[in-house]
Amino acid sequence: MIKVITGMRRCGKSFLLFELFTSYLENSGVSSDHIIKIDLEDYKNRAMRNPENLYTYVESRIVDNNLYYILIDEVQMLDDFKDVLNGFLKMRNTDVYVTGSNAKFLSKDIATEFRGRGFEVKMYPLSFNEYMSAYTGTPQAGLNEYMLYGGLPQILSYETEDLKVRFLKNLFEETYIKDIKDRYNIRKDQDLEELINILASGIGALTNPNKLANTFKSEKKSAITQDTIKDYIDHLCDSFLIEQSTRYDIKGKRYINTPFKYYFMDLGLRNARINFRQMEKTHLMENLIYNELRIRGFNVDVGVVPVITINKEGKQQRSQLEVDFICNLGSKRYYIQSAYRMESDEKIKQERAPLLKVDDSFKKMIILGEETPVTRDEYGITTISIYDFLLKDNALEL
């Protein structure tokens, strides 16, 4: 069975495979010559990107009937990798693990080519809890740093702001953007660059390709089509830079095709992209909560609750209230509001309103961006601090 570890660049896939897993195997008694490690991103291994060369090399390393562990990093750099992996599957004494940084070429293939013979393990940047295990300051200072520079493991090795900023900017430009341009042969890259800026400036905002195309036309004087914008967004999603969250009609029990919300999988990369401007903590916290829920394995949608209100003329009108997150994992479901501050009765009423219109028995929560005790009001709505949510594994059950 093929085990595929997917996730964004520099989130720790290689370290997991080549260091932690290799150490585990050796400590379990596996001989080092039965662990075949190939890093396809390493220039000295460029010849291995040819399927014939790679297959021949692995075949030459297998000299007995004992089990061999084949570990391949950045497998999407291998031409015709599906054929090669299928070849390894036919060997009776191999156990294959690969990593990859492009969902289009990996997740889809696992679901089709390797159905029943492979599974995907999604890897994310460090959670805040993991981040704090290596951070020496207070949770409050740690959260500020985490929201500013993100959770890529390497960021913790830099001691100065300048080094952190340079690392993130260089990673975005020289790795992510270059990879997308090269992989999809994008020559007119100005629109792609501008699209990334727009999405980074509007995290958590509802939008769609048609709306974005109109923005390009009116503000950027660009004739880019909505189909091209959709392709570019797909490329960004496939590279694990952003994720799309779909709206769900809670009462109608159906998905709404458009518009969508887009969240950056690492806030540090998002912030570096826009030169650490537009640092509204309301939006950063919403993105942070989304990421934490995804790390915990939840499917996360945007909730829509249709309501009827009375306008100033006394007439009924239809409108919609929004639940920030509907989180589903197996039989579990939670409705969650993100509120950086609730300093007035009006703000409390505003955050509660969508949750009160949800008439099922699943748990309803407000996550507050400051320290506060866990409370449950007369409507059954739990309020919890962002620190408890991020640092306690059982936070959703409090």
Language-model features: locations:
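Conserved ATPase-coupling elements of RecA-like P-loop NTPase cores
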Residues: 47-50, 76-85, 108-110
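Conserved glycine(s) of the Walker
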Residues: 12
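Interdomain hinge/linker elements that couple catalytic modules in large macromolecular machines
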Residues: 124, 129-306, 318
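Conserved P-loop NTPase "ATPase switch" module shared by AAA+ and STAND
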Residues: 63-81
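Short regulatory helix/loop adjacent to the ATP-binding pocket of P-loop NTPases
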Residues: 87, 104-119, 134-136
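Structural recognition of the conserved hydrophobic beta-strand(s) that form the central parallel beta-sheet
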Residues: 95-101, 122
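Short glycine-rich substrate-engagement loop in P-loop NTPases that contacts/grips substrate
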Residues: 36-65
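A cross-kingdom feature that marks ATP-driven nucleic-acid transaction machinery
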Residues: 1, 6, 15-16, 22-23, ...
